[in-house]
Amino acid sequence: MNFLSLFVLVPMVMLLGLWLAKGVKAVRGVMVVGSAALLALAIYLTIDFLGQRAAGNDAEMLYQASFTWFEPLKISYRTGVDGISVAMLLLSAIIVFTGTFASWRLNPNLKDYFLWFTLLSMGVFGFFISIDMFMMFMFYEIALIPMYLLIGVWGSGQKEYAAMKLTLMLMGGSAFLMVGIFGIFYGAGGETMNILDIANHTNGAHPIEFAQQCIWFPLTFIGFGVLGALFPFHTWSPDGHASAPTAVSMLHAGVLMKLGGYGCFRIAIFLMPEAANELNWIFLILTGISVVYGAMSACVQTDLKYINAYSSVSHCGLVLFGILMLTTSSTVGAVLQMLSHGLMTALFFALIGMIYGRTHTRNVNEMKGLMQIMPFLSVCFVIAGLANLGLPGLSGFVAEMTIFVGSFQNADTFHRVLTIMATCSIVVAAVYILRMVGRMLYGVCTDEHHKQLTDATWEERLAVICLIFAIAGLGLAPAWMSNLIDSSVAPIIETVKNAGPLVSSCNPFM
């Protein structure tokens, strides 16, 4: 059995264990063992991958395996990973592990909740190990379907509305994506769904005509971009985050939204380089709007989850922004931003859930003096805010600076003006983060109920500390992760840049 398949097999075993489990303790035990096993697999994979790269193995994808699943459409179960995939698998494993402890005391129906949560996790892991377009799409759908029930049943507020809105928007994106994938398949000769074969024009695949690329590129980019909160398709995100239970918000913002950026790079840009060079300016404008609009929208919110949700729109916009700049540095920064945002937004949502569970409010104006009442949670909240601001020594600084420096390497005025506009989001972020921290944590608490609140429990402390260590580790020692990502990004970006547009640029700003 292929090693990578364990990332799908372990969640399957977890599903069986949860189905057979009797009682809350058994359910928790299955989740702890399963999520710990996934984290151990991800750590081992990362170490072994780095070792193989150091030993000179420069293959595009490692640990490849395949078997034919549906011959008429050339669909196969194909697995393989590069540095980007390994980074995303590690992120996913960390958040599944910490999300398990963040949901420790969830009621009611903890068993059913973890069943759907595990199915969602399986879809995410399967997506990142797949190198067959259809298998990626299948796991993508597996990851989306549980979201409706997890929000609609275990959510809060306008949960039914938020669940339906999220499902309809993401399924609409899936429709674009399916058309784009089959367009790529038939445009490349209809012989293979293997991403590497299509990119390298092997095993019967031939180059996709430029005219076809200009049709399928926007469809696939929008299809994945909807999940990445691309403006103006982002409106599902704030409502979905605000209504989702804590661990679902963590996995949703921390990992699920990264499927969008990963898919845009892996399929849209990698397989259609000429169209990417020709049409990227359109989506650069949209992502630039996402970055600034998300940050400014966060400034006018008073609900903690909405603040973090709009902040996520801004940060995920920055991921797509870095990818579309088509430089090695900006793309490495975009992947680092996926990691950084995944960790810090998971930390934020975990802390918001813990605070809400005690105060029964998410309104910033209804909380004061929490630093004296819940010092552990408050200090962790400050750390999450500083990571969001891009404080040196934490993950946000490394990711954002790499994106901005890489973006500015484009010598033309259009790209540089957009980069300068995007950097303004850092200033705006300072407004909503510092205001939120100041109002919530300091001052004199006048609410008698709040004065009786307790600090974090042991399982909450474990989840939060794991995330903080990961954020600090990435910020203090980013070189190993940057090298891991660069080994996979650099050859792809070089290929894309060498392809160039096949017609004179249609960008009116160039």
Show which residues each predicted segment covers:
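Membrane-interface helix-loop-helix modules in multi-pass inner-membrane proteins
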Residues: 61-87, 133-136, 140-148, 389, ...
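Cytoplasmic juxtamembrane regions at transmembrane-helix boundaries
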Residues: 101-116, 246, 448-459
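Alpha-helical transmembrane segments and their helix-start/interface "positive-inside/aromatic belt" motifs
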Residues: 25-36, 161-171, 374-379, 458-466
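Transmembrane helix-loop-helix hairpins at membrane boundaries of multipass inner-membrane proteins
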Residues: 2-3, 17-101, 105-115, 191-192, ...
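Cytoplasmic/organellar membrane-interface segments at the starts of transmembrane helices
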Residues: 374-376, 433-510
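Central hydrophobic cores of alpha-helical transmembrane segments in multi-pass inner-membrane proteins
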Residues: 5-20, 34-45, 89-103, 120-122, ...
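Hydrophobic transmembrane alpha-helices and their helix-loop junctions in integral membrane proteins
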Residues: 98-104, 122-134, 148-439
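Hydrophobic alpha-helical membrane-insertion segments
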Residues: 33-50, 170-182, 377, 381-389, ...
